[in-house]
Amino acid sequence: MLHSITQLLSTNPYVVVLALDFSKAFDTVRHATLLQKITQLDLPDPVYNRFANFFSERSHCVRYGGEVSTILDINASIIQGSALGPVSYVVNAGDLTTVTPGNQIHKYADDTYILVPASIVREQKP
């Protein structure tokens, strides 16, 4: 991203950086939607199968002391810290990459930045 900012500054006096924070981004990804988007990428079968296996038939329960809760199925969320987590989120949010001409978007996992070259920046006072 620093390289992109430097390039934009070579032809524009300012670059506005919009940082977007999606609340609970990893928790809101539905597995069925993600797998549908992965299918649209036309990846080789072994790659698709890896994702499908990772997101299919997941469940969880809580053990506290000697007690175990009811087992619940999981049909949404990406496991944070997993190798497929950041890639899965980027695939899921991939259709959010349309920006106006001249602007750039940079994403990694749930961090999204939009770079907007500008010739004038006006300070807004409260």
Predicted regions and their residues:
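Nucleotidyl polymerases of mobile genetic elements and RNA viruses
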Residues: 1-126
